[in-house]
């Protein structure tokens, strides 16, 4: 494949992921096909976001690492010393992607390290490895372009996470602000009684203990359920099953108690 055809493969990957949930495994597969090497997309903390294998490496430690989707901390920390693309690293280097205990088997193994950057920060590392063939300038162009695309997608995913968290917080705050004083008091007692994200509640017992009417508890639960913060289901004489759907809800209740 010529450089243009290989570049188009990466462009297609970028167009596919636009506006969709990021699949780093598919991105790694595309880069493997374009560059012809093993590809590992590693986060700042060494989490293996995605990988694709061109040449199988028979080594138990490597297999375990891929299964656990986590690179060793010491190796990951070392990667951050590399600020620019470092190509064709041999197996004697501390940065080799081949198992050092099998240097004799993988003596012709070459590794290329490409920092993934975006938004003025280091987001992770793209690691390429293969046997017998060095990485050419064309390969490095594709690798750096691929790292840029991966960086854009990591930033996009982070933005989505931040937006989702902001939405969750806003929903919780709106739900709580819709409660009357007595309903809010009832809610605090309900989730003290629940002591977790889900469980059974007997409304009449709480009403008697706290000194509020059962209807206050029912109204409070109804408001929280209509806001999508909880789900509830009557189990007749056993009580009401309650499950928290929004992770921010219990945190907000705790914060209000502290205030």
Curated annotation (Swiss-Prot):
<dbReference type="InterPro" id="IPR036390">
    <property type="entry name" value="WH_DNA-bd_sf"/>
</dbReference>
<dbReference type="GO" id="GO:0003677">
    <property type="term" value="F:DNA binding"/>
</dbReference>
<dbReference type="InterPro" id="IPR029016">
    <property type="entry name" value="GAF-like_dom_sf"/>
</dbReference>
<comment type="similarity">
    <text>Belongs to the CodY family.</text>
</comment>
<keyword id="KW-0238">DNA-binding</keyword>
<dbReference type="InterPro" id="IPR036388">
    <property type="entry name" value="WH-like_DNA-bd_sf"/>
</dbReference>
<dbReference type="GO" id="GO:0005737">
    <property type="term" value="C:cytoplasm"/>
</dbReference>
<comment type="function">
    <text>DNA-binding global transcriptional regulator which is involved in the adaptive response to starvation and acts by directly or indirectly controlling the expression of numerous genes in response to nutrient availability. During rapid exponential growth, CodY is highly active and represses genes whose products allow adaptation to nutrient depletion.</text>
</comment>
<keyword id="KW-0678">Repressor</keyword>
<dbReference type="InterPro" id="IPR013198">
    <property type="entry name" value="GTP_trans_reg_CodY_C"/>
</dbReference>
<keyword id="KW-0963">Cytoplasm</keyword>
<dbReference type="InterPro" id="IPR014154">
    <property type="entry name" value="CodY"/>
</dbReference>
<feature type="region of interest" description="GAF domain">
    <location>
        <begin position="1"/>
        <end position="155"/>
    </location>
</feature>
<dbReference type="Pfam" id="PF06018">
    <property type="entry name" value="CodY"/>
</dbReference>
<dbReference type="Pfam" id="PF08222">
    <property type="entry name" value="HTH_CodY"/>
</dbReference>
<keyword id="KW-0805">Transcription regulation</keyword>
<dbReference type="GO" id="GO:0003700">
    <property type="term" value="F:DNA-binding transcription factor activity"/>
</dbReference>
<dbReference type="GO" id="GO:0005525">
    <property type="term" value="F:GTP binding"/>
</dbReference>
<feature type="modified residue" description="Phosphoserine">
    <location>
        <position position="215"/>
    </location>
</feature>
<keyword id="KW-0804">Transcription</keyword>
<feature type="DNA-binding region" description="H-T-H motif">
    <location>
        <begin position="203"/>
        <end position="222"/>
    </location>
</feature>
<protein>
    <recommendedName>
        <fullName>Global transcriptional regulator CodY</fullName>
    </recommendedName>
</protein>
<dbReference type="InterPro" id="IPR010312">
    <property type="entry name" value="Transc_reg_CodY_N"/>
</dbReference>
<dbReference type="GO" id="GO:0045892">
    <property type="term" value="P:negative regulation of DNA-templated transcription"/>
</dbReference>
<keyword id="KW-0597">Phosphoprotein</keyword>
């Amino acid at each position: 494949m010529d450089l243009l055809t290989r570049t188009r493969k990466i462009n297609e990957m970028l167009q596919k992921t636009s506006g969709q949930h990021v699949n780093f495994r598919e991105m790694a597969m595309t880069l493997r096909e374009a560059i012809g090497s093993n590809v590992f997309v590693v986060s700042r903390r060494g989490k293996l976001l995605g990988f694709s294998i061109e040449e199988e490496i028979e080594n138990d430690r490597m297999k375990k690492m891929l299964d656990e989707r986590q690179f060793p901390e010491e190796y990951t920390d070392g990667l951050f010393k590399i600020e620019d693309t470092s190509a064709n690293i041999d197996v004697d280097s501390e940065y080799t992607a081949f198992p050092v205990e099998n240097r004799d088997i993988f003596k012709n193994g070459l590794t290329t390290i490409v920092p993934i950057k975006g938004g003025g920060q280091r987001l992770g590392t793209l690691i390429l490895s293969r046997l017998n063939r060095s990485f050419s300038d064309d390969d490095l162009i594709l690798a750096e372009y691929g790292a840029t695309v991966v960086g854009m997608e990591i930033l996009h995913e982070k933005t989505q996470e931040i937006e989702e968290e902001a939405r969750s917080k806003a929903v919780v705050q709106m739900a709580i602000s819709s409660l009357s004083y007595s309903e809010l008091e009832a809610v605090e007692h309900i989730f003290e009684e629940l002591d977790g994200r889900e469980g059974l509640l007997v409304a009449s017992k709480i009403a008697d203990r706290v000194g509020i009417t059962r209807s206050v508890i029912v109204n409070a639960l109804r408001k929280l359920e209509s806001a999508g913060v909880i789900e509830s289901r009557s189990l007749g004489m056993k009580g009401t099953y309650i499950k928290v759907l929004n992770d921010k809800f219990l945190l907000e209740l705790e914060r209000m108690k502290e205030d």
